[in-house]
């Protein structure tokens, strides 16, 4: 089965392809109109992107949305994780907002939602969570997004 992945992120394309290949699913990319992420949850945004791509291509489409939610900040940055603060300053912004906050109040979780929309209207969705704390400073040089502080 051929499936479109609604992303321009080369790492995600490679990762999805590797995971789905043993199931006989071939991931493809397409020049897609970027869907506006107007959802209030990660699951809604994943659906919006997958549905838009499916409508545009007529093929099964998969999309994801993910981000970091910090308890002390009432769930910020949440669905705005990729657009939170200025690019390159997101981690520093979080650390500044949590400056002086004790460890026991630095709880956070990472949410990842994935959605697959089929041309016949079928929808498959899943959501997962990883719980932890926000560090007081960045650790390590590798990692993606908020990884060095989570």
Language model regions located:
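Anionic-ligand binding patches
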Residues: 1-4, 11-150
């Amino acid at each position: 089965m051929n499936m479109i992945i609604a992303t321009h992120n080369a790492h995600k394309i490679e990762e999805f392809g590797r995971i789905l290949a043993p199931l006989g699913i071939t991931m493809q990319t397409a020049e897609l109109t970027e869907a506006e992420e107007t959802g209030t949850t990660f699951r809604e945004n994943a659906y919006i992107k997958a549905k838009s791509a499916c409508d545009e291509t007529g093929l099964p489409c998969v999309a994801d949305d993910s981000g970091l939610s910090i308890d002390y900040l009432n769930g910020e940055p949440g669905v705005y994780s990729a657009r939170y603060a200025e690019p390159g300053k997101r981690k520093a912004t979080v650390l500044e907002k949590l400056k002086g906050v004790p460890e026991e109040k630095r709880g956070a979780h990472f949410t990842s939602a994935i959605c697959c929309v089929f041309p016949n209207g079928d929808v498959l969705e899943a959501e997962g969570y990883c719980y932890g704390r926000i560090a007081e400073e960045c650790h390590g040089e590798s990692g993606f997004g908020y990884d060095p502080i989570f």
